[in-house]
Amino acid sequence: MSFNIETTQGLERRVNITVPSEAVEQAVREELKRVAKNARIDGFRKGKVPAQMIEKRFGASVRQDVLGDLLQKHFFNVMLENKVNLAGRPEFTVEQFEAGKELKFTATFEVYPEVQLQGLDKIKVEKPVVEISDADIDKMLDILRKQQATWIETQDVAKADDRVTIDFVGSVDGEEFEGGKSTDFVLAMGQGRMIPGFEEGIIGHKAGEQFEINVTFPETYHAENLKGKAAKFSITLKKVEVMQLPELTDEFVAKFGPNTKNVADLRNEIAKNMQRELKNALVSRIKTQVIDGLLEQNPIEVPTAAVEQEIEVLRNQAAQRFGGNAQQAAQLPRELFEEQAKRRVQVGLLFSEVISSNELKADEERVKAMIADIASAYEQPAEVIEYYSKNKELMNNIRNVVLEQQAVDAVLTKAQVTEKASSFDEVMNPQA
């Protein structure tokens, strides 16, 4: 066998392979012998059919089967012997395949890029430093109380944190518009659900009043025909309710688990949960900065085949999230996922190089610590730990996550890391 590999463009390669006629005919003869052992032809016992008749009856189909085997065998032998990092499937073109002659074919394929990390010392990472304060815990406790709150009807005027029930009809230039009308609409004030000015127009009115408010739709409003338009809403205020928060009693505290017997216990549990959420948020934020830095300093071309595979993964995940199936997933436009798929392939290649160049292996102590951390959020942590330890797929997933974290840590040792004092809210709600 002879071959030569050439670069066509980018990551695309082409290999030209020639297989000697003797090797081709030997493969055909062996396959014909195998077929002859099981061939059934009237007038002959099984396995006793003359070779000429086998050749005449099965020769053409056998040669096609042998061709497929030879293409795969010799192509992948070349790939292995030359340590080619193949991406995706090859496309074969047969140039010569005739009895008694050499087999000549070409295979076009893509390879993964050779990644050589650079610029790690130019990556900038801002690491938030956060202390969870009593005020943070108080705020979270208030959220829990609000989740358990009841609403009491009042005859007072509506305020910014009340709940109201209204009928409304909206119009632009005197004409009602689609989606601008509702009856018995329940609105919890102060949550930013409505366009600017709508809730403010309700504040100060009492149940039973009818009034009009004038507002302007934002330029960023989702409905194209309403962007930036002045609108008038006719409103009937039917009910005003005030929030009544539950008292911090032992009965209230007991709703949050068997380990919370008093307010101090509840505050401790809240602090633990906040610490766990904060830890995960910090890991995610730092990882994102490291990834962004790696991509900026190491722009790499990625094989189309790998991107297409990732697009299919993202398509199926999107379909599953919305209750769809594989057929529906295939109908989702690839453009929706192309950039994300490309980024994921790039990140995978860069992290693989970080792991390889630093000879990293998943730290089993960190694996155990991560499982224990996950289990601590459940009422029976020991059962969760046992469940993970007996599930090979889950354990491998955790090891992969830990290995990624170790790769991030390896980059951080060379990156420019600065610490910044931050609040819990700043880290958990960066867009607020």
UniProtKB/Swiss-Prot annotation:
Enzyme Commission (EC) number: 5.2.1.8
UniProt protein name: Trigger factor
Compartments where found: Cytoplasm
Predominant localisation class: cytoplasm
UniProt cross-references to InterPro entries, sorted A to Z: PPIase_dom_sf, PPIase_FKBP_dom, Trig_fac, Trigger_fac_C, Trigger_fac_C_sf, Trigger_fac_ribosome-bd_bac, Trigger_fac_ribosome-bd_sf, Trigger_fact/SurA_dom_sf
Phylogenetic classification of the source organism: Bacteria, Pseudomonadati, Pseudomonadota, Gammaproteobacteria, Pasteurellales
Molecular function terms, GO-annotated: peptidyl-prolyl cis-trans isomerase activity; protein folding chaperone; ribosome binding
Domain called PPIase FKBP-type: residue spans: 161-246
